[in-house]
């Protein structure tokens, strides 16, 4: 009972929403209006009402309370929801708007004139309820070309072209609802930078092309100079190479008077190129060779001053020589050169120098240089053959001696390449009275072409004899027999590749001294001892151990202590090495030792390393390990 009373009291104290609605004056008015209806329905049983008056209103109260329940906010909200039409969120329904006024079709002329208010005909206005569900969908993009096509279809064919042509500019500006604005307006940071195309200037382009051509020409000129200098330094080492370089594939036609005048500028160019190639020689050699060149030029002038009668006799002598066989010509030339013809040797050296000059200037004019060199050589040889019949003057003998005793092969090349060696002959041939001399020169050139092979064969045999014989007098005879142009080919300057063959000295070679045996070093006894591992001195271990024991110790005990200390220090060294390697160092530092002693338990926060050293080690070791203050305001060890 007490529980029920308490429950009722709690209900009264905190009324529910239903009780609050019932207690409202509006609810009471509704109950009063419904009481007559209830009494009419229960008019038949009045007697029963008296008997159980308290029960009848209780029977009809549920109907009244059911009506009252319908008035709650929940029921009212439910009824509102039930009265509303059912709309599914998935299946969208388009709302059809009733058109109050029928849209009258406008003529196309009026519709095209109002381009600002023109809208798309196919688009249907959407309801707000529908657009809420279409927020995530993208609008359909419509291009202007499609819009124009649709407009053309709806317009009559007669007015389509005229109206669209007149309103083409305005149609591009009209506002179409479905056309999206370009993204470039909103996101200007994403715009691509316009490419700046530089305008090409024709004058600048042509100037650049000309500069490139000039650079290419300059590079080609430098390459030509380098190749010409390299060809000038190449050497002909063997006699076979000399023969190959002097051979010809065909007999060239003889030069006439007209060709001489046409070839003169080429000769001057070849002379200048030869002068350029000769500038690389040292200055002191040039000074020594200039005297020889002047002597040779004076002798050539003397030989060219002979009369025409002498030249005719020489010409007859040359005709007699041509009837001989090549073998006899080779033998006669060998005998003639051995006896008294050093000038012919000089002419042959001149011929060889002309061929070398041709190799040096091959990059500039190959074919013209061959003709010029052969012409100059034939001129000199003709003049010298004419002078062979005459008696040799002292000056000619001096020239022969100069040509025989030249120390360096550079002198012969300098004489061949200098303008003084060929200028008198070339100038004297241009005179009107020198026609017989020209004919003699041409014939002597043909003779030398046929006889040079025999001379070279003899030179090869003599070269082999020179290699086999080592005595000095035999080498001198062989050098006299061999022609000068073979020596010039063998002793050409070799500044880069290989040095020239040295001339043998007249002094006899000394026998080699016997090599003395080196004294064997005496082996010391300390070196024969086996190397031992580093270890602590036994005296130090005894001293430290006796310091702490302070009692007499036997020898066996010291041995055991030494073994223990050795093992202990080996283990310490391995641990310290591991610590240093782990730290990335190759040296053991104080921090590694302190870390090891801390792990062993010797060093702690209460017992630092310095205190431990001061307690257990004597003064001499303390001075080495930790700083100690001494008299005189000094600290040991000094840091």
Curated annotation (Swiss-Prot):
<feature type="compositionally biased region" description="Basic and acidic residues">
    <location>
        <begin position="329"/>
        <end position="338"/>
    </location>
</feature>
<feature type="region of interest" description="Disordered">
    <location>
        <begin position="266"/>
        <end position="294"/>
    </location>
</feature>
<feature type="region of interest" description="Disordered">
    <location>
        <begin position="307"/>
        <end position="451"/>
    </location>
</feature>
<keyword id="KW-0498">Mitosis</keyword>
<keyword id="KW-0131">Cell cycle</keyword>
<dbReference type="GO" id="GO:0046982">
    <property type="term" value="F:protein heterodimerization activity"/>
</dbReference>
<dbReference type="InterPro" id="IPR028255">
    <property type="entry name" value="CENP-T"/>
</dbReference>
<feature type="region of interest" description="Disordered">
    <location>
        <begin position="494"/>
        <end position="534"/>
    </location>
</feature>
<keyword id="KW-0158">Chromosome</keyword>
<comment type="function">
    <text>Component of the CENPA-NAC (nucleosome-associated) complex, a complex that plays a central role in assembly of kinetochore proteins, mitotic progression and chromosome segregation. The CENPA-NAC complex recruits the CENPA-CAD (nucleosome distal) complex and may be involved in incorporation of newly synthesized CENPA into centromeres. Part of a nucleosome-associated complex that binds specifically to histone H3-containing nucleosomes at the centromere, as opposed to nucleosomes containing CENPA.</text>
</comment>
<feature type="compositionally biased region" description="Polar residues">
    <location>
        <begin position="267"/>
        <end position="281"/>
    </location>
</feature>
<dbReference type="GO" id="GO:0051382">
    <property type="term" value="P:kinetochore assembly"/>
</dbReference>
<dbReference type="GO" id="GO:0003677">
    <property type="term" value="F:DNA binding"/>
</dbReference>
<keyword id="KW-0238">DNA-binding</keyword>
<dbReference type="GO" id="GO:0000776">
    <property type="term" value="C:kinetochore"/>
</dbReference>
<keyword id="KW-0995">Kinetochore</keyword>
<feature type="compositionally biased region" description="Low complexity">
    <location>
        <begin position="12"/>
        <end position="23"/>
    </location>
</feature>
<comment type="subunit">
    <text>Component of the CENPA-CAD complex, composed of CENPI, CENPK, CENPL, CENPO, CENPP, CENPQ, CENPR and CENPS. The CENPA-CAD complex is probably recruited on centromeres by the CENPA-NAC complex, at least composed of CENPA, CENPC, CENPH, CENPM, CENPN, CENPT and CENPU. Identified in a centromeric complex containing histones H2A, H2B, H3 and H4, and at least CENPA, CENPB, CENPC, CENPT, CENPN, HJURP, SUPT16H, SSRP1 and RSF1. Interacts (via N-terminus) with the NDC80 complex.</text>
</comment>
<protein>
    <recommendedName>
        <fullName>Centromere protein T</fullName>
    </recommendedName>
</protein>
<dbReference type="GO" id="GO:0051301">
    <property type="term" value="P:cell division"/>
</dbReference>
<keyword id="KW-0132">Cell division</keyword>
<feature type="compositionally biased region" description="Basic and acidic residues">
    <location>
        <begin position="432"/>
        <end position="449"/>
    </location>
</feature>
<comment type="similarity">
    <text>Belongs to the CENP-T/CNN1 family.</text>
</comment>
<dbReference type="GO" id="GO:0005634">
    <property type="term" value="C:nucleus"/>
</dbReference>
<dbReference type="GO" id="GO:0000278">
    <property type="term" value="P:mitotic cell cycle"/>
</dbReference>
<dbReference type="InterPro" id="IPR009072">
    <property type="entry name" value="Histone-fold"/>
</dbReference>
<dbReference type="InterPro" id="IPR035425">
    <property type="entry name" value="CENP-T/H4_C"/>
</dbReference>
<feature type="region of interest" description="Disordered">
    <location>
        <begin position="458"/>
        <end position="477"/>
    </location>
</feature>
<dbReference type="GO" id="GO:0007059">
    <property type="term" value="P:chromosome segregation"/>
</dbReference>
<dbReference type="Pfam" id="PF16171">
    <property type="entry name" value="CENP-T_N"/>
</dbReference>
<keyword id="KW-0539">Nucleus</keyword>
<feature type="region of interest" description="Disordered">
    <location>
        <begin position="1"/>
        <end position="64"/>
    </location>
</feature>
<dbReference type="InterPro" id="IPR032373">
    <property type="entry name" value="CENP-T_N"/>
</dbReference>
<feature type="compositionally biased region" description="Basic and acidic residues">
    <location>
        <begin position="356"/>
        <end position="371"/>
    </location>
</feature>
<feature type="region of interest" description="Flexible stalk domain">
    <location>
        <begin position="80"/>
        <end position="500"/>
    </location>
</feature>
<feature type="compositionally biased region" description="Acidic residues">
    <location>
        <begin position="458"/>
        <end position="469"/>
    </location>
</feature>
<dbReference type="Pfam" id="PF15511">
    <property type="entry name" value="CENP-T_C"/>
</dbReference>
<keyword id="KW-0137">Centromere</keyword>
<feature type="compositionally biased region" description="Basic and acidic residues">
    <location>
        <begin position="307"/>
        <end position="319"/>
    </location>
</feature>
């Amino acid at each position: 009972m007490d529980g029920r009373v308490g429950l009722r009291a709690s209900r009264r104290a905190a009324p529910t929403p239903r009780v609050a609605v019932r207690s409202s004056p509006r609810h009471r008015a509704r109950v009063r209006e419904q009481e007559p209806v209830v009494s009419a329905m229960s008019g038949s049983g009045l007697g029963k009402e008296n008997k159980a008056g308290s029960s009848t209103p209780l029977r009809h109260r549920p109907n009244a309370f059911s009506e009252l329940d319908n008035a709650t906010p929940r029921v009212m909200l439910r009824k509102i929801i039930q009265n509303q039409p059912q709309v599914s969120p998935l299946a969208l329904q388009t709302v059809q708007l009733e058109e109050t006024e029928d849209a009258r079709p406008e003529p196309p002329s009026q519709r095209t004139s109002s381009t600002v208010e023109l809208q798309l005909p196919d688009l249907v206005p959407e309801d707000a309820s529908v657009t809420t569900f279409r927020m995530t969908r993208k609008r359909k993009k419509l291009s202007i070309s499609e819009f124009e096509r649709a407009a053309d279809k709806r317009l009559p064919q007669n007015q389509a072209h005229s109206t669209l042509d007149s309103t083409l500019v305005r149609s591009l500006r009209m506002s179409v609802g479905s056309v999206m604005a370009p993204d470039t307006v909103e996101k200007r940071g994403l715009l691509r930078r316009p490419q700046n195309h530089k305008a090409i200037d024709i004058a600048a382009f042509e100037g650049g092309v000309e500069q490139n051509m000039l650079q290419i020409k300059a590079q080609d000129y430098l390459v030509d100079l380098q190749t010409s200098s390299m060809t000038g330094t190449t050497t002909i080492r063997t006699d076979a190479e000399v023969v190959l370089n002097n051979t010809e594939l065909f007999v060239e036609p003889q030069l006439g008077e007209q060709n001489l005048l046409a070839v003169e500028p080429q000769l001057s160019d070849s002379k200048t190129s030869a002068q350029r190639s000769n500038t690389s020689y040292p200055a002191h050699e040039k000074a020594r060779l200039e005297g020889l060149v002047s002597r040779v030029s004076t002798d050539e002038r003397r030989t060219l001053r002979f009369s025409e009668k002498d030249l005719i006799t020489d010409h007859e002598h040359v005709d007699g020589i041509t009837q001989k066989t090549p073998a006899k010509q080779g033998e006669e030339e060998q005998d003639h050169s051995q006896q008294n013809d050093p000038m012919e040797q000089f002419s042959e050296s001149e011929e060889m120098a002309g061929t070398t000059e041709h190799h040096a200037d091959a990059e500039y004019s190959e074919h013209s240089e061959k003709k010029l060199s052969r012409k100059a050589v034939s001129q000199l040889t003709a003049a010298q053959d004419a002078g062979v019949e005459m008696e040799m003057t002292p000056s000619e003998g001096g020239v022969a001696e100069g040509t025989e005793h030249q120390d360096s092969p550079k002198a012969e090349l300098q004489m061949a390449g200098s303008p003084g060696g060929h200028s008198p002959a070339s100038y004297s041939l241009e005179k009107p009275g020198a026609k017989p001399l020209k004919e003699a020169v041409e014939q002597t050139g043909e003779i030398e072409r046929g006889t040079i092979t025999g001379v070279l064969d003899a030179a090869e045999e003599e070269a082999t004899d020179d290699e086999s014989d080592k005595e000095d007098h035999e080498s001198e005879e062989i050098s006299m027999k061999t022609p000068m142009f073979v020596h010039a080919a063998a002793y050409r300057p070799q500044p880069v590749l290989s040095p020239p063959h040295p001339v043998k000295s007249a002094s006899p070679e000394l026998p080699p001294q016997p090599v003395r045996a080196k004294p064997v070093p005496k082996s010391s006894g300390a070196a024969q001892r086996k190397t031992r591992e580093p270890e602590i001195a036994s005296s130090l271990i005894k001293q430290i151990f006796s310091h702490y024991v302070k009692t007499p110790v036997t020898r066996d005990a010291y041995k055991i202590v030494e073994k223990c200390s050795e093992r202990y220090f080996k283990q310490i060294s391995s641990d310290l090495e591991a610590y240093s390697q782990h730290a990335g160092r190759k040296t053991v530092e104080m921090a590694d030792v302190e870390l090891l002693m801390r792990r062993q338990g010797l060093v702690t926060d209460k017992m630092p390393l310095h205190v431990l050293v001061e307690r257990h080690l004597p003064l001499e070791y303390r001075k080495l390990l930790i700083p100690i203050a001494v008299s005189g305001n000094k600290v040991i060890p000094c840091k």
